[in-house]
Structure formats: C-alpha cells, structure tokens
Amino acid sequence: MKFQPLGERVLVERLEEENKTSSGIIIPDNAKEKPLMGVVKAVSHKISEGCKCVKEGDVIAFGKYKGAEIVLDGVEYMVLELEDILGIVGSGSCCHTGNHDHKHAKEHEACCHDHKKH
C-alpha cells in the first residue's frame, strides 16, 4: 500500500532490535524497548521539494515518545514530524544531497535547518 506523508512528515520503518544480549540471553518480544532508529520509507512533497534534509533510505534517530504508529500491509511504521528527527545516522551533514555549496555555517543553518521557511 502506498503512503504519502503530508506537511513536514516522514514515514519510517523501525530498525529491528537484537533478540539477545551480548552474553547470549534471549530477550522476549514483550520485554524489548522499541528502537529509536529507523529507515525513512517516504517523505512529504514539502520536504522532498523544500529543504531535502531527509530522503528515502536515510537511517534516522528520533525521540522516544514521538510520532504516530500506523500499520500498512501488516507492517508497523512511524509517521514523524520533521522536527522530531534527531539526526541522520552515518551522514556527515544534512546537506548530503550534494545540492549545497555553503562557505559559511550561517548559510548552512538557514538552508537546512529553518524548515518553517521552506
């Protein structure tokens, strides 16, 4: 099923957490903490055509009590506001799209982090 987030939102599939500890103890599903990282599966048009800070396939970190859970075709997803994303894992900069050529940090901040203007 296709899902297109609206506003400044992204659709995220949580990354699976390990089922056992480093010492080999198996953790039952009901005792596991839900992971705070996931893979972006879809972004709203406002993000994809605006700041482009997050794109499909990015691994992101997000706040523990953020977003709304939905189920699509039997798979659990999170719908998160752009402002609830803490960062992109494994990326040196949110300008990883390669479309930016900033010489000063203030230009970078204005372009990539002032989402309300885009």
Swiss-Prot record:
Signal peptide: none
Record keyword Mitochondrion present: no
Annotated Pfam families: Cpn10
GO CC list: cytoplasm
Keyword field: Chaperone, Cytoplasm
One record GO biological process: chaperone cofactor-dependent protein refolding
Homology family: Belongs to the GroES chaperonin family.
Name listed for the protein in its UniProt record: Co-chaperonin GroES
